[in-house]
UniProtKB/Swiss-Prot annotation:
Gene Ontology BP annotations: formation of cytoplasmic translation initiation complex
GO function terms (MF aspect): methyltransferase activity; RNA binding; translation initiation factor activity; translation initiation factor binding
Subunit structure: Component of the eukaryotic translation initiation factor 3 (eIF-3) complex.
Biased composition (Acidic residues): 13-28, 176-199
Cross-referenced PANTHER family: EUKARYOTIC TRANSLATION INITATION FACTOR 3, SUBUNIT 8 EIF3S8 -RELATED, EUKARYOTIC TRANSLATION INITIATION FACTOR 3 SUBUNIT C-RELATED
UniProt main location, coarse: cytoplasm
Similarity comment: family membership: Belongs to the eIF-3 subunit C family.
Keyword Heme included in the entry's annotation: no
Protein name, as recorded: Eukaryotic translation initiation factor 3 subunit C
Taxonomic source organism: Medicago truncatula
Amino acid sequence: MTSRFFYQGGDQSDTDDEPTDIDDEPSDTEPAPTDPNGKSKYLAGGNADDSDDDDGQKRVVKSAKDKRFDEMASTVDQIKNAIKINDWVSLQESFDKINKQLEKVMRVIESQKIPNLYIKALVMLEDFLAQASANKDAKKKMSPSNAKAFNSMKQKLKKNNKQYEDLIIKCRESPESEGEKDEDDEDSDEYESDDEMIEPDQLRKPEPVSDSETSELGNDRPGDDGDAPWDQKLSKKDRLLEKMFMKKPSEITWDTVNKKFKEILEARGRKGTGRFEQVEQLTFLTKVAKTPAQKLQILFSVVSAQFDVNPGLSGHMPISVWKKCVQNMLVILDILVQHPNIKVDDSVELDENETKKGDDYNGPINVWGNLVAFLEKIDAEFFKSLQCIDPHTREYVERLRDEPQFVVLAQNVQEYLESIGDFKASSKVALKRVELIYYKPHEVYEATRKLAEMTVEGDNGEMSEEPKGFEDTRIPAPFVVTLELVARKPTFPENSRTLMDVLVSLIYKYGDERTKARAMLCDIYHHALLDEFAVARDLLLMSHLQENVHHMDISTQILFNRAMSQLGLCAFRAGLVSEAHGCLSELYSGGRVKELLAQGVSQSRYHEKTPEQERLERRRQMPYHMHINLELLESVHLTSAMLLEVPNMAANVHDAKRKIISKNFRRLLEVSEKQTFTGPPETVRDHVMAATRVLINGDFQKAFDIIASLDVWKFVKNRDAVLEMLKDKIKEEALRTYLFTFSSSYDSLSVVQLTNFFDLSLPRVHSIVSRMMVNEELHASWDQPTGCIIFRNVEHSRVQALAFQLTEKLSILAESNERATEARLGGGGLDLPPRRRDGQDYAAAAAGGGSGTSSGGRWQDLSYSQTRQGSGRTGYGGGRALSFSQAGGSGGYSRGRGTGGGGYQNSGRTQGGSALRGPHGDTSTRMVSLRGVRA
């Protein structure tokens, strides 16, 4: 597509920079240049029914491809025109139209490549939408139809742009390198006060400059340059340089710089304002700033403008811009340290002439800015860049090498905030430093420390504000010289634990609640990473985070899940199988491990996520180098469940369904047992299920071999020690399973025989059997002289167990019938024993609900109150925290926090069931109150 940029006729005036409303209208509807015969270029290529055909004019036949592109270009012009007048109804129509035209263009060109014209139109619409959304006053003034179209357009554009995210990001990063350039965009922006580019004709013909502009910046324009190439252009920054340096440095005043600074700020966010150009203009103004305060003020605006380079939420700031942003922040800190009387504040209204005060002013000077907010934004952009870059490329590793630059910036900001006494803000910076350290094992931390030590001062040369040659020839030394006073290299203690202790102590003392909670979770994670399970567990239990985590933000909940996962891995490495299972059981209860750990987007057959939900979830993803190995996590979880469930199933063979430790494991085992043919194990689940089957049969050696054949154990620290521990645990559980299964077949059993069976030492076997006796899992006693176990046959047979169950159910049924009869008779009809009336009201009510009838009076009140009491603990405390403390051997902790110790848990299940069943009973029964009768 040929742009109108190359069809400018000789009659174009030099006053195009100041168009009137009349001039704007035809420029947007493409009144094409005319040929020498006076015929319009575009009318010549019109459709076959054009009236000009009757004049005998020669027609220009266009290909279908050109026609489609011309139609799209015309629609883009309509979009630009609608943007100018803020007409969202027309924008919506044009947007639908250009999408239909895109389908036609794609069919014609027979290619999968999206036209650059369409992508630039999407970028233009996205920018205008963001600008309109930010302007709340303008939104209120919209007409109902315009507001409705605006809201509809917002949804359509978000949904449409999702499939072109990568192309939009590339277009934003390098808009001029995307094939053919869309000069129409620049041509339509000639109404702006400053052109984006200056035409060659304008270079040879100096423009008349107003007297006010002459007095400010000099009236010299670039002279005639006959040797210049035909397509030579000057950017805004070059024009600004020419204007500034035609004057003597002494003639550049604070007012001159301040006025130009305001002009640049007013153009920020305006259509047609180049973001990179604005950053360069502001960067140049820092060179000519007259006072340190003015330079600081402009530097803050430079950093803000650099943040605007990538306005989209899906992309990230270009890495080169990010590095310049870090350098600018370091220069800001240099100025603040060099001039202690300058204070940065974003909460007070500042005087316009505040930055006019120079070095000779000794009083406080206030400059708008927020160091912590800027630091957090830089950290967020670094995080987003790691999310977007492919982790399997060299680029990802190179990006990780930029981390020390952020670390040194955070160190300097924290030191400055502490020096001025702002400890609350410094605690937020300390949290950012903690979040860069907590997930790193000692080896990675040591590598980071060595990388920072090897970094030399010259490594940051590419982050200089301007190219070297440009600085040497055109920009003189800055008017305000800033010394490098803050460190440019980070410092790390030799031990990561030392640094963590210093930072979290500061946060615990001065941070807010969210900051403290996140610091605590990072601390727990780091202790678990260093195999300090007892310390990490105590921190978790004493902080009570597990009770309040549901009320925290999603990122903190993700951090909590990560901490629990690492705690489970730490417990497993330490040989604490039940504790490891307690930490990981709830994580695997819903089958959404990837989502809970923010390591991927989970897909569900029953719940389809909207594009917006999926986009939000992807923004929360953890960078690849922070991931926890999911295969290792699943191996630890299923292996722990196997070691707990196999003896449990053997001990409760007659009532296996009621006493379940891991529902997830039982479900997988049932699926595995239903398979007709079982092939060799491939996945982690297959290996654990195969090991479970052979362990139930008593073959502990084969079970260990299957588990040890998993490749994931290579990711475990001290792999050999962990596998040796795992082998001992499998032997121990095999022994327990054997005793549970065959104890009824023995009157006595020699300990020596058990040691030979299971390859365990005599003291170890003695310890295991004694523990089973103490816990009343095994009804037996020791015969010390002979070294035998004497079994007492108190196990009930199958018939006896069924008889006991029948008796219990009949008793409950009888009581429920008595309650129902009492309610129908109005109370007092049956003289129930006081013990049953007062002590067993709720148990009877539960049975009544199960039989389809329910009684009124006290049991209803009791069930309501008890259900409320139970609900306070059964939701989260009864899930994650309770299972963890039970598994961790901290039964006293969980019972102490409940009501009534172990009875609390037992009644909780019954109460919950009755509360659900009660309302489905007899309505007349529920309406009767027996409180007065019983009194």
